A protein has these predicted regions:
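Glycine-rich phosphate-binding "P-loop"
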Residues: 131-158
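Low-complexity, highly charged intrinsically disordered N-terminal segments
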Residues: 97-130
Length: 405
């Protein structure tokens, strides 16, 4: 370079970009899951990062775990890359946690031990317990205050905007599949030395208004619900603010009213088990009362090491046969059948006693959602069908008969 010529700093795409303006149409349009990426300057990479614009499971798994899942191994076909699967519960459950509090405890310990500088988690609005507020928690108390799932679309990745200049060099991100797919895609561009990812399994999120419709059509006192979950006993468990619990059988849902309440992003998602996370903490592969954990790589084991001494650990188990129930469910859901409550209760009791349990229940839930979502995609976005459904989901879906139209 000739003497006297100024050295020009080369900026990266996200340094030149700005978050989308409020009220803008998001690139994924109706399929947008509001993950928050476009609410940060990392919107610069949205075409390569958005789970609903570009499916990149194999590349993501290989980058995060060193390999993609083995499609000939049934456990990996369903649950993703893994080093270890187990069930567990905290020996001393966290008061007010959704289950026993394993995810919250890991976040707290990651800060207490100095493993990370901050935890990306989701608090709640002071005005509404179901309105999510993503945050970079710096203290265990902030992580604890964020306990309990928020079953609405949450823009977690908008907090990426806060990273530059924050002093955060090591981050634990807690999130669901669509958020983690985008996060993994932009990971090389983040101002971080280390990123740990604790994933939550996720299906059937809703907008805040959709949640209200669901609660009002399902539960006796919508205004007092603190949290809820679709559980392994084929019932939805609601906890109310007075500490009482209420359960409603899956089969008693008002399907005609609720069929369109779930977000289009969730109806076109095939990342139920959070393929890009280092460690996954949920319940779908465990028996009732326990949580299901999948360690995908050494970082995932490092996260589990933080808390394992505090856990009651047991092997995963599996029993029953899901396939007939899945096939019948495809047809019932497609016809939007609503059963009388007495019949729904009876079917629920029979299925709870004789139906799939443990990993087989997890496969039941995956099969049911993947077949439903394939149908929804075929009917609503046929142009995306071939490229959008990953190979593992195609293999699972091919085991069932879907309506032809």
């Amino acid at each position: 370079m000739p003497q006297g010529c100024p050295v020009m700093a080369v900026s990266t795409p996200h340094e030149r970009a700005r978050p989308l303006a409020k009220g803008s149409t998001y690139p994924a349009k109706d399929l947008c899951s509001q993950c928050g990426l476009c609410d940060s300057r990392w919107v610069a990479y949205v075409k390569q990062s958005c789970a609903f614009l570009t499916q990149r499971f194999e590349a993501m798994e290989t980058a995060a775990h060193g390999r993609s899942r083995d499609l000939e191994n049934d456990d990996e076909l369903y649950f993703g890359v893994q080093q270890r699967m187990l069930t567990a519960r905290l020996q001393r459950p966290i008061e007010g946690a959704q289950w026993t509090g394993i995810a919250s405890r890991i976040g707290m310990l990651a800060l207490e031990t100095g493993l990370v500088d901050a935890v990306l988690c989701v608090g709640q609005s002071p005005d509404d317990r179901f309105t999510p507020v993503p945050q970079l928690a710096r203290t265990p108390a902030e992580v604890l205050a964020a306990r309990v799932n928020k079953p609405t679309l949450s823009p977690n990745l908008k907090v990426l905007e806060q990273l530059p200049g924050s002093g955060i060099h090591r981050l634990l991100a807690i999130g669901v599949g669509c958020q983690i797919q985008a996060l993994r895609a932009v990971q090389p561009t983040l101002p971080l030395e280390q990123l740990y990812v604790l994933g939550l399994p996720c299906v059937d999120n809703v907008s805040r208004q959709g949640l209200q419709t669901f609660l009002e059509s399902t539960v006796s006192s919508p205004q007092t619900v603190v949290h809820y979950e679709f559980m392994q006993d084929f019932r939805i468990h609601f906890r109310h603010s007075d500490g009482s619990e209420e359960t409603v059988p899956f089969f008693g849902l008002d399907t005609p009213k609720l069929k369109d309440v779930f977000a289009p992003s969730c109806l076109s998602c095939f990342d139920y088990t959070n393929a890009g996370a280092d460690l996954v903490v949920g319940y779908m592969g465990a028996t009732l009362g326990r949580q299901w954990l999948t360690v995908r790589n050494p970082k995932g084991q490092q996260l589990l090491d933080l808390v394992e001494a505090e856990l009651d650990v047991a092997p995963v188990t599996s029993s029953g046969n899901r396939q007939a129930a899945v096939q019948q469910g495809i047809e019932a859901y497609d016809k939007a059948v609503k059963l009388p409550l007495w019949l729904a209760q009876l079917i629920g009791l029979v299925v709870e006693r004789f139906g799939p349990k443990g990993l087989e229940y997890g496969r039941f839930s995956i099969d049911s959602h993947f077949t439903r979502n394939a149908l929804w995609l075929r009917r609503n976005h046929p142009e995306k069908l071939e490229a959008h459904i990953p190979a593992f989901a195609q293999k699972i879906i091919s085991r069932y008969r879907l309506p032809k139209t």
